[in-house]
Amino acid sequence: MPAGRAARTCALLALCLLGAGAQDFGPTRFICTSVPVDADMCAASVAAGGAEELRSSVLQLRETVLQQKETILSQKETIRELTAKLGRCESQSTLDPGAGEARAGGGRKQPGSGKNTMGDLSRTPAAETLSQLGQTLQSLKTRLENLEQYSRLNSSSQTNSLKDLLQSKIDELERQVLSRVNTLEEGKGGPRNDTEERVKIETALTSLHQRISELEKGQKDNRPGDKFQLTFPLRTNYMYAKVKKSLPEMYAFTVCMWLKSSATPGVGTPFSYAVPGQANELVLIEWGNNPMEILINDKVAKLPFVINDGKWHHICVTWTTRDGVWEAYQDGTQGGSGENLAPYHPIKPQGVLVLGQEQDTLGGGFDATQAFVGELAHFNIWDRKLTPGEVYNLATCSTKALSGNVIAWAESHIEIYGGATKWTFEACRQIN
C-alpha cells in the first residue's frame, strides 16, 4: 500500500474512533490496521471490538445445544423403555387366555417383580372379598381364644359370658360366609345381592372388632408390661410394629425372641434395623424357599432355624465384630455357628428398628412378600454375646432369665400400625 494512502487510512480510522465515543479517555493513541481498499473503515473497527462478545455468545449457544441434545437422548431412552414394557404387556395379554379375568380381578404377583401390597390376590372381586372375610374371621377367633385363656387365668365371669356371645356371633358369620361361597359356586346371586350381603357381614365384623377391642383394653390395663405378644395375621406391606428406641453403636450383640408361625413359603421378616445409607444394617428374614438368614451390613449368613410348624419357638443369634463370629440357638440349644460375617463392622447407631417388615428405605419401603406372618414376643437385644447358659435360661423361662440391656420387651416401648395387635402372653405357660 502507498505511504500516502496508509496515512489517510489511519486518519480515517482515528476519526471513526473519536466519533464513536464522546467521552475523553486521556491522551489519544492511533492504531493502524491494514484493510481492503473498498472496505468500510468504521464498520471494520466496530466489528473488531465485538469479536470477543460474539465468541462468548457462540460458546454459550454451543453449550445450550449440547445440553438439549443430552436431554433428547435421555427422553428417547425413556420412550424406548416404556415402549418395550408396553410391548411385553401386550404380548402377555395375547398369550394368556385368562388375561381378561386377570385385568378384572388382579393376578398373582411373582416374587421379585416389584412391590406387593397385599400378597396373594384372588381371581375375582367376590372371591377376594370372601378370602379377606375368612382371614378376618380367623383373626377374630384367635383373639377370642386369647381372651378365653386370659379369662380362665383371672376367673372373670363377665368376660366369659361376653366371650360366649362373641363366639356365637362369629359362628353365625362363618355360616353366612360359607353360604355365600356355596352360592358363588352354583353361579347364583347378582351384583345387588353381593353388595347387600357384603354390607351386612362387614357391619357385623365392625361391631365384633369394637367389642373385642374393649375386652382387650380391659385385659391390657391389668397385665404386666412385658406379658404381651404381637400378632401379624396377614401378609401386607402396612402391618408392622416399631420400637421407639434406637440402637447404640455395638461391637457385639445377642438378639432373642419367641416366634410362632405356620406361614409358607417363608415366615417373612421378624425384625429389621436400618440406618441412613444402609437399609440392611441388621435383619432377620426367611423369604420364599430360602432358609432363615441374618444380614449384617448387607452380608448374609444362613441359619439352621425351622420354625414354621405353627408352634412357639425361642430363637437367639449372637455375634461379635471380632472375626464376625456368630452362633444360632433354637429352643435353648445351639444349632449352628460361623465366622466372617461382617467382621470388624460395628452396628451403626441412630437407626430405625421395625418388627414384622423388611425395610428397603429408612423406616419404610415395605414389601408384602417379605412381611412376617405369625406371632412374636419377648424381643430383647443385648450389647454383648450371651453365654449358652444364659440363652438356656431364657428358653426355659427360668427366674434367672435376663432382660435386654439395649432393648427390653416392654409394651410402652412398642408402637403398632396397620392392624397388628397386642394381647396377653406368658412364655412357657401358653406355649404349644
Curated annotation (Swiss-Prot):
Q: Name one GO molecular function term.
A: metal ion binding
- InterPro entries recorded for this chain? ConA-like_dom_sf (IPR013320), Neuronal_Pentraxin_Related (IPR051360), Pentaxin_CS (IPR030476), Pentraxin-related (IPR001759)
Which PROSITE patterns does the protein's record reference?
PTX_1, PTX_2
Q: Which GO terms describe its cellular component?
A: endoplasmic reticulum; glutamatergic synapse; synaptic cleft; transport vesicle
Which positions are glycosylated? N154, N193
Classification via SMART domains? PTX
Cross-referenced CDD domains: PTX
Record note on what altering E327G does: In SCA50; uncertain significance; abolishes secretion; loss of multimerization ability
Q: Where in the cell is it found?
A: Secreted; Cytoplasmic vesicle, Secretory vesicle; Endoplasmic reticulum
Q: Which disease is it linked to?
A: Spinocerebellar ataxia 50: A form of spinocerebellar ataxia, a clinically and genetically heterogeneous group of cerebellar disorders. Patients show progressive incoordination of gait and often poor coordination of hands, speech and eye movements, due to degeneration of the cerebellum with variable involvement of the brainstem and spinal cord. SCA50 is an autosomal dominant form characterized by cerebellar ataxia, oculomotor apraxia and other eye movement abnormalities, and cerebellar atrophy on brain imaging.
Function noted in UniProt: May be involved in mediating uptake of synaptic material during synapse remodeling or in mediating the synaptic clustering of AMPA glutamate receptors at a subset of excitatory synapses.
**UniProt subunit comment:** Homooligomer or heterooligomer (probably pentamer) with neuronal pentraxin receptor (NPTXR).
Protein's recorded name: Neuronal pentraxin-1
Q: What is the lineage of its organism?
A: Eukaryota, Metazoa, Chordata, Craniata, Vertebrata
Name of the encoding gene? NPTX1
